Amino acid sequence: MAVTPYVDTSRLDGKVALVTGSGRGIGAAMAIHLANRGAKVVVNYANSVEAANKVVDEIKSRGGEAIALQADVGEVSQTTKLMDDAVAHFGQLDIVCSNSGVVSFGHLKDVTEEEYDRVFRINTRGQFFVAREAYKHLSVGGRIIMMGSITGQAKGVPKHAVYSASKGAIETFVRCMAIDCGDKKITVNAVAPGGIKTDMYHAVCKEYIPNGENLTDEEVDEYAKTWSPMDRVGQPMDIAKVVGFLASEDGEWINGKVIGIDGAACM
């Protein structure tokens, strides 16, 4: 009786992945993790070329292949060029992770038109057109993975209407886009992180804590870890591992879904 050889379907060997906003934080963790799984990676950045190059260097130090490409995904023409350049460099594109985003807090009475537009330009409009261009450039059977937020699903957060709404729209995007992308067998999903300890973590986290502005960074950590029964704060790699799964063959039958990743946190 012939034995079927084992194939590690979690691997991404032969695939090319592009991660927007991957010079730092969750995006950097995604890029590094996808490379660790075998993918060649395009590290996108808007302004921080030094940070992006550090991610590329780390990937290469582990034996992977990566390139840093600049583009502001708030400008559709730059998004199109980013995808064109990725395909020109690596010859194909199989995975697009739409990670770029901005955060915003402000009471309803204080939110300006400029602030509203700034947030939706990247978090919502930007992600929509990243997905559009991904559809055009991805190989058959590709993956689009978008970035939501637990605030798009959770109870109301004070002074967070604009940001939460900009992320809530992503949930509708993935449900509809998954149908549109079916003709190319492309899956479309999103991850919705809770609080994740990135370089912006302490400043942002204080906004979720009553009187948080008076807490030290250590006190913020102690408070925030109580949100999860796991008694710890989320890390960028917690998100990257789920993205790696969705990007792999193992995640093929997950489509049109938003996966909350918050350690069962209750803010």
From Swiss-Prot:
Pathway field: Pigment biosynthesis; melanin biosynthesis
GO biological process, alphabetically ordered: melanin biosynthetic process
Pfam families: adh_short_C2 (PF13561)
Similarity comment: Belongs to the short-chain dehydrogenases/reductases (SDR) family.
InterPro entries, alphabetized: NAD(P)-bd_dom_sf, Sc_DH/Rdtase_CS, SDR_fam
EC number: 1.1.1.252
Enzymatic reactions: scytalone + NADP(+) = naphthalene-1,3,6,8-tetrol + NADPH + H(+)
Source species: Zymoseptoria tritici (strain CBS 115943 / IPO323) (Speckled leaf blotch fungus)
Quaternary structure and partners: Homotetramer.
Highest taxon, organism lineage: Eukaryota
Annotated binding of NADP(+), by residue: 26, 72, 99, 132, 163, 167, 196, 198
Name of the top EC class for this enzyme: oxidoreductase
CDD domains according to UniProt: THN_reductase-like_SDR_c
Keyword set, alphabetical order: Melanin biosynthesis, NADP, Oxidoreductase
Phylogenetic classification of the source organism: Eukaryota, Fungi, Dikarya, Ascomycota, Pezizomycotina
Entry protein name: Probable tetrahydroxynaphthalene reductase MYCGRDRAFT_87994
UniProt GO molecular function: tetrahydroxynaphthalene reductase activity
Task performed by this protein: Probable tetrahydroxynaphthalene reductase; part of the gene cluster 29 that mediates the biosynthesis dihydroxynaphthalene (DHN)-melanin, a bluish-green pigment and a structural component of the conidial wall. Catalyzes the NADPH-dependent reduction of 1,3,6,8-tetrahydroxynaphthalene (T4HN) into (+)-scytalone.
